[in-house]
């Protein structure tokens, strides 16, 4: 995981931190910096290096790398004045606010809790009642499959207090969709709506699968889906592909021209049929998704 931010007007370059996810762990990210404190470079610790020692980056024991001036720059700008060991990248360069927790961190939480039920203890954090941060990565209760990740891309907080299919906004057909903006005012009061993983404005999504047991030419698969992940079909695009499939090719329809042979337009059409009668129609879509995928 690498998080970075430009230095802004009057300065060149950017500051950053990168951490390697342990092999038995999973992580998540949703438009909000998640790297907080991290181990600093020292003579005794060979697992961490700064950008001054990038020549060591391929050493297998290295798990943390950071810009040598990531803390120095924060001090110069007045963003941080504590001890180096207390420096948090997220709290300094991308501090959490309400939307950062409820619209971003909540998506990571929903993914984590699918694979570690103990993550339910962070519900109070997601509800903005407490301020403890979630771990950057977790050990899942079992090994994840491609299907697990496809399901995660279709998440609307089902089974949680944030479940999009519940409440007045869901209407008579338990819709998991809410129109933008997420935050709005009505009669002088401010309201908000949840931001799930799957949304109607998604252009495309994918799951990258790397299979070391398969021939190199076909070992990599990009399970690629166009439009809303809730109603799309994830298609395997192999690393040995030599031409783009007709259904995904530029020129087969456009943003203004419908095409019955365009994967985007077909997925979009199915989704638009489902939205008004979600609880009636989506179960049928889900059955077909399972068979086709």
Segments from the language model and where they lie:
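C-terminus-biased signal that marks the final domain/tail of proteins
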Residues: 7-293
């Amino acid at each position: 995981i690498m998080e970075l931010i430009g230095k802004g007007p009057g300065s060149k370059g950017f500051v950053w931190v990168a951490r390697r996810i342990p092999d038995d762990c999973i992580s998540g990210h949703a438009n909000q910096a998640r790297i907080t404190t991290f181990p600093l470079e020292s003579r005794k610790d060979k697992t961490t290096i700064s950008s001054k020692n990038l020549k060591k980056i391929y050493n297998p024991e290295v798990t943390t790398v950071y810009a040598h001036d990531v803390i120095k720059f924060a001090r110069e700008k007045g963003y941080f004045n504590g001890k180096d060991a207390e420096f948090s990248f997220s709290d300094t360069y991308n501090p959490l606010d309400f939307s950062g927790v409820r619209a971003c961190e909540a998506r990571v939480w929903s993914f984590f809790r699918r694979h570690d039920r103990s993550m339910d203890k962070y519900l109070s954090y997601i509800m903005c009642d407490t301020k403890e941060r979630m771990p950057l990565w977790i050990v899942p209760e079992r090994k994840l499959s491609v299907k697990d990740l496809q399901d995660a891309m279709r998440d609307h907080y089902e089974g949680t207090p944030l479940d999009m299919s519940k409440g007045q906004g869901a209407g008579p057909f338990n819709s998991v969709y809410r129109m933008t903006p997420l935050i709005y005012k009505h009669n002088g009061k401010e309201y908000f709506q949840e931001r799930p993983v799957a949304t109607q404005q998604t252009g495309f999504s994918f799951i990258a699968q790397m299979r070391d047991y398969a021939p190199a030419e076909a070992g990599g698969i990009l399970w690629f889906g166009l439009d809303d992940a809730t109603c799309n079909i994830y298609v395997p695009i192999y690393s040995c592909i030599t031409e783009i499939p007709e259904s995904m090719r530029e020129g087969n329809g456009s943003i203004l021209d419908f095409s019955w042979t365009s994967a985007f337009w077909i997925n979009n059409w199915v989704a638009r049929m489902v939205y008004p009668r979600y609880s009636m129609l989506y179960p049928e879509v889900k059955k077909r998704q399972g068979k086709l995928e």
